[in-house]
Curated annotation (Swiss-Prot):
Single GO BP term: dihydrofolate metabolic process
Catalytic activity, EC: 1.5.1.3
Protein name: Dihydrofolate reductase 1
Gene name for this UniProt entry: folA1
Role, per record: Key enzyme in folate metabolism. Catalyzes an essential reaction for de novo glycine and purine synthesis, and for DNA precursor synthesis.
Limits of the DHFR domain: 8-185
Catalytic activity as recorded in UniProt: (6S)-5,6,7,8-tetrahydrofolate + NADP(+) = 7,8-dihydrofolate + NADPH + H(+)
Pathway: Cofactor biosynthesis; tetrahydrofolate biosynthesis; 5,6,7,8-tetrahydrofolate from 7,8-dihydrofolate: step 1/1
Entries under Gene3D superfamilies matching the protein: Dihydrofolate Reductase, subunit A (3.40.430.10)
Keyword NADP tagged: yes
Any GO CC annotation of this UniProt entry: cytosol
Keyword Aminoacyl-tRNA synthetase listed: no
């Protein structure tokens, strides 16, 4: 078994009151303030996302992007995009980018905590990585929408750390006291 380099997985998601995160390849709401805080949060950090989510978005500047895909014929689109066919390879690639300092965000050298890797969707990727994440930043959209993609319920092991109210949504930070070790991926 390979040892995965040290990194903290943090999920970032926007979900409505029913945990809807998507509809027909997009999101059924538009909050520019939420998009700004999201981009500011992940800027300079490595990110992991699924192929369909990657294809539905514009490239995110200042982020090392690891795309989780089952297509082993994919190759890097640029110096900042890498494809991975397993969760282990995805985390290893993101951790390498974070450890290099080039994509370590504000946590680089700030203290002894490991570099942060953000997991930004979609549904299957959230389901896969949630047990291994130490934190979740959830933009809770105060709407009830139709959807075809959902964020999983956070169980009793998750504790709310903070809540920032905004017009139409709250940004809530949750912490999981004992995430599963990344080597169990």
């Amino acid at each position: 078994m390979t040892m995965i380099p040290d990194t903290e997985l943090v999920l970032v998601v926007a979900a409505d009151e029913n945990n809807v995160i998507g509809l027909d390849g997009g999101v059924p709401w538009h909050y520019p303030e939420d998009v700004r805080q999201y981009k500011n949060r992940i800027a300079g950090h490595p990110i992991i996302l699924g192929r369909r989510t990657f294809e539905s978005m514009k490239p995110i500047p200042d982020c090392y992007t690891v795309v989780l895909t089952s297509d082993d014929r994919r190759s890097a689109d640029s110096e900042t995009v890498e494809y991975a066919t397993t969760p282990q390879i995805a985390v290893e690639a993101a951790a390498r980018a974070g450890a290099s300092g080039a994509f370590a965000g504000d946590s680089a050298g700030a203290d002894s905590s490991p570099p942060v890797t953000y997991v930004i969707g979609g549904e299957a990727v959230y389901d896969l990585f949630l047990p291994f994440a130490g934190r979740v930043f959830l933009s809770r959209i105060h709407e009830h929408n139709e959807g075809d993609r959902y964020f999983p319920d956070l169980g009793a092991e998750w504790t709310e750390l903070s809540r920032e109210p905004h017009d139409g949504f709250d940004v809530i930070e949750y912490e999981q006291a004992s995430p599963r070790p990344l080597d169990d991926l």
